[in-house]
């Protein structure tokens, strides 16, 4: 969008500035080239890859999600037990990462379940 110097927007913008020159903060149309200086910067867009497995039904998708949450819980418990009985076999950060993954997954699952129950109650209480 280009601002015409004869427009009312231009005059209201420059009304407090005395002088014949344009306002010092007025847009000049300068373009800044952005270059990638680090590997973590945004690069070319890749097309999304289709998943290897797509659930056939909602119930199957929920079952798979709950199974993966359970697997995370089991993995965290196993690492915790290894840490207690053989501390040199596992690093403390591995135990913490597994425990946090399991906690976040369980919290998310509980939030989803609470939302479903709340929605069901609202639907059944409609009159």
Swiss-Prot record:
Q: Does the keyword Ligase apply?
A: no
Q: What is its main location?
A: other
Q: Does the keyword Coiled coil apply?
A: no
Give an example GO cellular component term for this record. bacterial-type flagellum basal body
Which InterPro entries did the record assign?
A: FliE
Task: Give the keywords, sorted.
Answer: Bacterial flagellum
For this chain, one GO molecular function annotation is: structural molecule activity
One GO biological-process annotation of the entry reads: bacterial-type flagellum assembly
Pfam families given in the database record = FliE (PF02049)
Q: Where in the cell is it found?
A: Bacterial flagellum basal body
Cross-referenced HAMAP family: FliE
The similarity comment for this entry is: Belongs to the FliE family.
Q: Which NCBIfam families match?
A: fliE, PRK12729.1
What protein name applies here?
Answer: Flagellar hook-basal body complex protein FliE
Q: What is the lineage of its organism?
A: Bacteria, Pseudomonadati, Spirochaetota, Spirochaetia, Leptospirales
Underlying gene: fliE
């Amino acid at each position: 969008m280009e601002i015409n110097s004869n427009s009312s927007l231009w005059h209201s913008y420059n009304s407090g500035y005395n002088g014949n020159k344009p306002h010092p903060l007025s847009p000049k149309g300068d373009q800044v080239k952005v270059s990638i200086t680090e590997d973590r910067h945004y690069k070319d867009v890749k097309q999304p890859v289709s998943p290897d497995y797509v659930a056939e039904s909602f119930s199957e998708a929920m079952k798979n999600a709950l199974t993966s949450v359970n697997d995370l819980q089991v993995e965290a418990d196993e690492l915790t037990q290894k840490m207690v009985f053989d501390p040199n076999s596992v690093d403390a950060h591995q135990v913490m990462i597994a425990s946090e993954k399991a906690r976040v997954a369980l919290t998310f699952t509980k939030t989803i379940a609470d939302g479903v129950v709340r929605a069901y109650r609202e639907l059944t209480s409609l009159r």
